[in-house]
Curated annotation (Swiss-Prot):
It is found in: Cytoplasm. Homodimer. It comes from Streptococcus pyogenes serotype M6 (strain ATCC BAA-946 / MGAS10394). HAMAP family: Asn_tRNA_synth (MF_00534). It is an enzyme of class 6 (ligase). This is Asparagine--tRNA ligase. Its EC number is 6.1.1.22. CDD domains: AsnRS_cyto_like_N (cd04323), AsxRS_core (cd00776).
Length: 448
C-alpha cells in the first residue's frame, strides 16, 4: 500500500478519516457477517471491525467475499497493512475503533507458540523473543523506556553531564567475589560491577556526572530481585552534603514516577497498577530513619502476628523480609541511613564522631519491593582511605588512580546508584525482575 502510515497511539487525531496502519494481529474473533481484529504496532493496541456487507458493496460480491475471508482466516502475529475509518466508540476498551475497508497481508504467521492461554514460566522465558510481543510485556517495556527518558531529562535539568565509565576494568568497585573475569590480552580483566570509581574522577573534573549502562554481578542468586546483567544509573557529585544527596535522590525517584505517569499511562492501565499509590509517593515526603532506629523498630515488632522476619541485633545486616517490613511500616519509600561500616564498602565516609557507622543510605521501596537505591558520601581524606584499605588488606596499587583523587584537591563528594530493572519492577507493579529487562540474564539463563 502506498498510503502514509500512522501509529495506533495517534488514532485519536484522525477520527472520521480513512487511515492505514502497519501492524500485527494480536487476536481475532467474530462470526457470520462480522470480524473483530485486535491490532498492535508497538505504540498501542487497537481494534478493527470488518463487516461483510460493506466489503461486498465496495468490491463486488466475488472480490468482497474474498477480502472478507482473508480477514476471517488471519492468524495470530500475521503482519498486515490495514486501512479503515477511525471512529470513536465508548464501548471499546480502546476508546476508538477502526471500520476496516481493506487489508493486505505482509507476512504470514502459522502456529504461533505464545498463544493467549496460560503458559509456564520456563516456556515463556525460552520464547522471550516472542513473549515480548504480548500486551503486558510491551507495557513493561514502555514503562522502562519512560524511566530511562526521565533519567536523562532529570540529570540534564540538574546540571549533570553524561560521563561514560568503562565496562572492562582491572579492579572491583564492590565485592571482588562477584566478578566476571575475562582474558585481556594475557592479563585478567573484569566486567564492571559499577562505574562509581571512574565517576568519582569525573566529578573531580566536571562537578556533577552520571552514567547509565550495563553492569555485571556474578551472584549465584535465584531470587526475584537479582540478575547477573542489569542496567545501572550511577551519579557522582562534588560539594554536596549527605542531606543534600538524599534530597537529590528523592527528587530523582519522584521524577521517574512522574515520567511514567506522563509518558506511559496506558501501560500502567494494562498492568492494573495502583496509580493512586504512585501519585502518593510523589506528593508525600519520603521517610528517613537511621539503621539503629530501624533495628530497634524491628525488635519491638518482631512478636507481632503479621511479622515473619528473623531476629536481628545491632550490627546485623537486613534481609529482604526486614526491608519489606520497614518500608511497609512507613508506607512510602524510606531511606535507611548510617549503616555499620563492618558490612559496607571501603570507600564510604564515617559518620563524624561515630566511626562504626558510615554516611550512607539505602532507599527501600514499599509494597515489598525492597532496596532500589544505594548511595553514600565517599571518604575524601587520603590518609583515612589508605588506613581503611590497609585494615581490609587491600592491594593499594590496584587503586592508584582512585587514591590520586584524594591527593590533588580532594573535596567532599558522594553518589548513588539505582538498578533500573528494580525501579521498573516497582513502578510497573510486577512480581519478578526478569520481566523488567528485554532479555534477562540469570543464574541458569543466558539465552535467548
Amino acid at each position: 500500500m502506498s498510503k502514509k502510515l500512522i501509529s495506533i497511539v495517534n488514532v485519536k487525531d484522525y477520527v472520521g478519516q480513512e487511515v492505514t496502519i502497519g501492524a500485527w494481529v494480536a487476536n481475532k474473533s467474530g462470526k457470520g457477517k462480522i470480524a473483530f481484529v485486535q491490532l498492535r504496532d508497538g505504540s498501542a493496541f487497537f481494534q478493527g471491525v470488518a463487516f461483510k456487507p460493506n466489503f461486498i458493496e465496495k468490491y463486488g460480491e466475488e472480490s468482497g467475499l474474498e477480502k472478507f475471508d482473508v480477514i476471517k482466516r488471519l492468524n495470530q502475529e500475521t503482519s498486515v497493512y490495514v486501512t479503515g475509518i477511525v471512529k470513536e466508540d465508548e464501548r471499546s476498551k480502546f476508546g476508538y475503533e477502526l471500520d476496516i475497508t481493506d487489508l493486505e497481508i505482509i507476512g504470514e504467521s502459522h502456529e504461533y507458540p505464545v498463544t493467549p492461554k496460560e503458559h509456564g514460566t520456563d516456556f515463556l522465558m525460552d520464547n522471550r523473543h516472542l513473549w515480548l510481543r504480548s500486551r503486558k510485556q510491551m507495557a513493561v517495556m514502555q514503562i522502562r523506556n519512560a524511566i530511562i527518558y526521565a533519567t536523562y531529562e532529570f540529570f540534564d535539568q540538574n546540571g549533570f553531564i553524561k560521563f561514560d565509565s568503562p565496562i572492562l576494568s582491572e579492579n572491583a568497585a564492590e565485592d571482588s567475589t562477584e566478578l566476571f573475569e575475562t582474558d585481556y590480552f594475557g592479563k585478567p580483566a573484569f566486567l564492571s560491577q559499577s562505574g562509581q570509581l571512574y565517576l568519582e574522577a569525573g566529578a573531580m573534573a566536571l562537578g556533577r556526572v552520571f552514567d547509565f549502562g550495563p553492569v555485571f554481578r556474578a551472584e549465584k542468586s535465584k531470587t526475584r530481585r537479582h540478575l547477573t546483567e542489569f542496567w545501572m544509573m550511577d551519579a557522582e557529585y562534588s560539594f554536596l552534603s549527605h542531606e543534600e544527596s538524599l534530597d537529590l535522590q528523592e527528587a530523582y525517584v519522584k521524577a521517574l514516577i512522574q515520567g511514567v505517569l506522563d509518558r506511559a499511562p496506558q501501560a500502567l492501565d494494562i498492568l492494573e497498577r495502583d496509580v493512586e499509590a504512585l501519585k502518593r509517593y510523589i506528593t508525600e515526603p519520603f521517610k528517613r530513619v537511621s539503621y539503629d532506629d530501624a533495628i530497634t523498630l524491628l525488635q519491638e515488632h518482631e512478636a507481632d502476628e503479621d511479622t515473619d522476619y528473623e531476629h536481628l541485633e545491632h550490627g546485623d545486616d537486613f534481609g529482604s523480609p526486614h526491608e519489606t517490613w520497614i518500608s511497609n511500616y512507613f508506607g512510602v519509600p524510606t531511606f535507611v541511613v548510617n549503616y555499620p561500616a563492618s558490612f559496607k564498602a571501603f570507600y564510604m565516609k564515617p559518620v563524624p564522631g561515630n566511626p562504626e557507622r558510615v554516611l550512607c543510605a539505602d532507599l527501600l521501596a514499599p509494597e515489598g519491593y525492597g532496596e532500589i537505591i544505594g548511595g553514600s558520601m565517599r571518604e575524601d581524606n587520603y590518609d583515612a582511605l589508605v588506613a581503611k584499605m590497609d585494615e581490609l588488606g587491600m592491594d593499594k596499587s590496584e587503586y592508584d588512580f582512585y587514591l590520586d583523587l584524594r591527593k590533588y584537591g580532594s573535596v567532599p563528594h558522594g553518589g548513588f546508584g539505582i538498578g533500573i530493572e528494580r525501579m521498573v519492577t516497582f513502578v510497573a507493579g510486577t512480581k519478578h525482575i526478569r520481566e523488567a529487562i528485554p532479555f534477562p540474564r540469570m543464574l541458569h539463563r543466558i539465552r535467548p
